[in-house]
């Protein structure tokens, strides 16, 4: 797989209450990813960028919500997220990652 493509697959970590609970309980990390990325690309990208071993990847499409601004109704974009399960003994600390 092209390394340039792998560096662009992961857009951002998802930091929320649910993601911290999943991280503590199941040793998983949640990322916002490109909408056309597949599980294989996500696994390779995480292993390349964070130097960890990945055991499993689950992906989910998140539907954009309808939002209102005054009398105008708009819609947020759909996006894709990946639940990445790390091997025992590995972890990703976003506070120390540059």
From Swiss-Prot:
Role summary: One of the early assembly proteins it binds 23S rRNA. One of the proteins that surrounds the polypeptide exit tunnel on the outside of the ribosome. Forms the main docking site for trigger factor binding to the ribosome.
GO molecular function: rRNA binding; structural constituent of ribosome
NCBIfam families with a match to the protein in the record: PRK05738.1-3, PRK05738.2-4
GO biological process: translation
Keywords, sorted A to Z: Ribonucleoprotein, Ribosomal protein, RNA-binding, rRNA-binding
Highest taxon in the source lineage: Bacteria
GO cellular component, one term: ribonucleoprotein complex
S-S bonds: none
Protein name: Large ribosomal subunit protein uL23
Family: Belongs to the universal ribosomal protein uL23 family.
Pfam families xref list: Ribosomal_L23
InterPro entries with a match to the protein in the record: Nucleotide-bd_a/b_plait_sf, Ribosomal_uL23-like, Ribosomal_uL23/eL15/eS24_sf
Record text on subunit structure and interactions: Part of the 50S ribosomal subunit. Contacts protein L29, and trigger factor when it is bound to the ribosome.
């Amino acid at each position: 797989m092209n390394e340039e493509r792998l560096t662009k697959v992961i857009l951002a970590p998802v930091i929320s209450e649910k993601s911290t609970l999943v991280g503590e309980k199941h040793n998983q990390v949640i990322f916002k990813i490109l909408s056309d990325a597949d599980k294989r690309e996500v696994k390779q990208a995480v292993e390349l960028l964070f130097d960890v071993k990945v055991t499993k990847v689950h992906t989910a499409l998140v539907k954009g919500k309808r939002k209102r601004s005054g009398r105008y109704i708009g819609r947020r974009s759909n996006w894709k997220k990946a639940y990445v399960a790390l091997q025992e003994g590995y972890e990703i600390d976003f506070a120390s990652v540059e």
